[in-house]
UniProtKB/Swiss-Prot annotation:
The modification N6-lipoyllysine is found at K65. Residues 24-105 form the Lipoyl-binding domain. PANTHER family: GLYCINE CLEAVAGE SYSTEM H PROTEIN, GLYCINE CLEAVAGE SYSTEM H PROTEIN-RELATED. GO terms for biological process: glycine decarboxylation via glycine cleavage system. The lineage of its organism: Bacteria, Pseudomonadati, Chlorobiota, Chlorobiia, Chlorobiales. Its cofactor is (R)-lipoate. The glycine cleavage system is composed of four proteins: P, T, L and H. NCBIfam families: gcvH (TIGR00527), PRK01202.1 (NF002270). Belongs to the GcvH family. Binds 1 lipoyl cofactor covalently. This is Glycine cleavage system H protein. PROSITE patterns: BIOTINYL_LIPOYL, LIPOYL. It comes from Prosthecochloris aestuarii (strain DSM 271 / SK 413). Keywords: Lipoyl. GO terms for cellular component: cytosol; glycine cleavage complex.
Length: 127
């Protein structure tokens, strides 16, 4: 299972990567999550401009046998939705690169302290 060391993780199996500008971040679901969900057929996110609070539902992932909510790892505003999600299977094939869900403008970097490192997430999922 792939758990990149340069990302932070949530107990809900989302990841977040702060971009080089330090003010925006990409959010997606983990390799573990996509594996557990199975073949993903549809992803729906809230639109650009949506304000999020930590743990808010910002979308859903629909797989062949289940639907799962997507939870915001931190406070922010959605500034971009990944158009590659029109082909939802990209989340299965590339959850950390091409299959990211939303880009958010960050509000409070101190919230990162509550997120897990790759080692902590790996331990949580038993890898």
């Amino acid at each position: 299972m792939n758990i990149p060391a340069d990302l932070l993780y949530t107990k809900d199996h989302e990841w977040i990567k702060v971009l080089d500008d330090g003010t925006t971040a990409l959010v997606g679901i983990t390799d573990f999550a996509q594996s557990e969900l199975g073949d993903i057929v549809f992803v729906e996110t809230k639109p650009v401009g949506t304000e999020l609070s930590e743990h808010d539902v910002f979308g859903t992932v629909e797989a062949v046998k289940t639907v799962a909510d997507l939870f915001a790892p931190v406070d922010g505003v959605i500034v971009e939705v990944n158009e590659a999600l029109d082909a939802a299977e990209v989340v299965n094939s590339s959850p950390y690169e091409d299959g990211w869900m939303v880009k958010v403008s960050l509000k409070d970097a101190s919230q990162f302290d509550a997120l897990m490192s790759a080692a902590e997430y790996s331990e949580m999922v038993g890898e």
